[in-house]
């Protein structure tokens, strides 16, 4: 993937924001207050509690309640006990607001560590943290969108900002691997949101187009669409004309729901639909009604993952069960990564020679090797500087039997990039599931 395509798609900052030094008043604090502050670690948490990506942050209030409970007695590091304060800001799913909230957490709240759940906000937040010398960890976006989106390279990385997640290349290996056994003509229709991750999947050199070409697929590229788009008639028409048996690309749930409705109205019925981002949540599949049966997706995390939390000791299955019993709602994939973000942050603080020394925390992150609820997070041994690549697989949503707790379940159908995660069944054609 080229750095230029990611920079253009992500709208990465071109001007650096610098810390403005405080006046004499900042130096005249009361000694007792200064001592209390020095024994409090302040963690900033930037997330999406509202807006178009609010479903990614839906579980955060619940998760934060449990993280705070785990940290109620503080952290004892080097013989000193530190209270831990978590300051939360909502990006409202807007990159510009994300930049503003990042600045507020760094300059007004003066956090010791910034954790960023919103990968779109991570672009501006990472640049601000690097300029101001504040350690940052982000997640929930392909690493290429962060590394290349900010004009860096796998060899260069960043001075203070880190990211853990899988890469777009891992998704493609799973998508194409999952389709390999299908007994259909290799015709593929693709469409992509015009944003950083969308450009990652559409990249001519390393994205879906190149993967399709290498494997003998005939691709009909529906191109990029703006996030506010609600008309996909051109894509539907071109896919139907090309008799595309498989539909793929990158789209959010609301986009796909509109596309699928228009496809059904036009009589277009592909045999497989594997759309990155669109089917991460059970609600997205449920919104399609019976048509949701058989939709396939990348999988970052499920209760089936054989990992446990370094923070609470819970297994993936136990964490998901905790959420379902507490809320009555089905588990979602971001639950695992939101939890892991705090696992990484807390581990770095514990491993730092001084958790109030930002360079020491940065160094601890650079050397981190942690077994977490989402799997191994290894910054130290990673060939991509400032990035830890985490395991991911692919799977298919299946309608459950009558009387089941939830209408759909996510079944793992391919694991070529993470064989430690067991496959549960093979991918089935939509026509097979419809006739079953």
Q: Where are the regions a protein language model picked out?
A:
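Extracytoplasmic "Venus flytrap"
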Residues: 44-67, 89-95, 118, 191-202, ...
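N-terminal secretory signal peptides
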Residues: 1-13, 26
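Extracytoplasmic ligand/sensor domains, especially the bilobed periplasmic-binding protein
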Residues: 111-223, 272-297
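Beta-alpha junction/loop-to-helix N-cap segments that form part of ligand/metal-binding clefts
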Residues: 55-62, 74-151, 225-232, 253, ...
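C-terminal segment of N-terminal export signals and the immediately downstream linker at the start
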Residues: 11, 32-49
């Amino acid at each position: 993937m080229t750095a230029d395509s990611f920079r253009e798609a992500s709208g990465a900052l071109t001007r650096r924001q610098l810390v403005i030094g405080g006046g004499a008043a900042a130096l005249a604090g009361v000694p007792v207050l200064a001592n209390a502050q020095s024994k409090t670690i302040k963690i900033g948490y930037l997330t999406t509690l509202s807006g178009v990506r609010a479903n990614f942050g839906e579980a955060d209030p619940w998760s934060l309640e449990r993280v705070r409970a785990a940290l109620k007695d503080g952290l004892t590091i080097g013989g000193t006990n530190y209270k831990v304060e978590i300051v939360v800001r909502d990006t409202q799913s807007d990159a510009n607001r994300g930049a503003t909230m990042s600045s507020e957490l760094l300059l007004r709240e003066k956090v010791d560590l910034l954790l960023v759940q919103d990968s779109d906000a991570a672009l501006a937040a990472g640049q601000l943290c690097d300029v101001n010398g504040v350690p940052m960890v982000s997640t929930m976006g392909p690493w290429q969108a962060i590394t290349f989106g900010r004009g860096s390279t796998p060899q260069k990385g960043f001075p203070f900002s880190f990211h853990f997640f899988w890469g777009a290349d891992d998704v493609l290996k799973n998508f194409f691997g999952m389709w390999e056994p299908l007994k259909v003509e290799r015709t593929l229709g693709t469409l992509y949101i015009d944003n950083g991750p969308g450009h990652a999947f559409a990249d001519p050199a390393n994205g879906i187009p190149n993967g399709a070409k290498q494997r003998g697929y005939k691709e009909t590229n529906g191109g990029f669409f703006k996030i506010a788009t609600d008309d996909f008639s051109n894509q539907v028409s071109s896919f139907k004309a090309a008799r595309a048996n498989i539909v793929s690309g990158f789209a959010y749930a609301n986009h796909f729901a509109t596309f699928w409705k228009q496809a059904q109205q036009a009589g277009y019925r592909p045999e497989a639909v594997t759309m990155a981002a669109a089917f991460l949540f059970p609600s997205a599949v449920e919104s399609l009604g019976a048509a949701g049966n058989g939709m396939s997706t990348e999988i970052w995390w499920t209760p089936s993952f054989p990992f446990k939390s370094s923070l609470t000791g819970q297994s993936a299955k136990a964490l998901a069960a905790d959420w379902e019993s507490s809320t009555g709602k089905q588990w979602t994939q971001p639950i695992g990564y939101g939890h892991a973000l705090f696992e990484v942050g807390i581990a770095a603080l514990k491993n730092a020679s001084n958790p109030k020394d930002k360079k020491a925390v940065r160094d601890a992150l650079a050397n981190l090797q942690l077994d977490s609820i989402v799997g191994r997070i290894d910054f130290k041994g990673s060939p991509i500087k400032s990035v830890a690549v985490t395991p991911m697989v692919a799977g298919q949503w299946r309608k459950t039997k009558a009387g089941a707790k939830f209408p759909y379940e996510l079944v793992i159908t391919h694991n070529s990039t993470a064989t430690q995660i067991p496959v549960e069944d093979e991918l089935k054609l939509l026509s097979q599931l419809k006739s079953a």
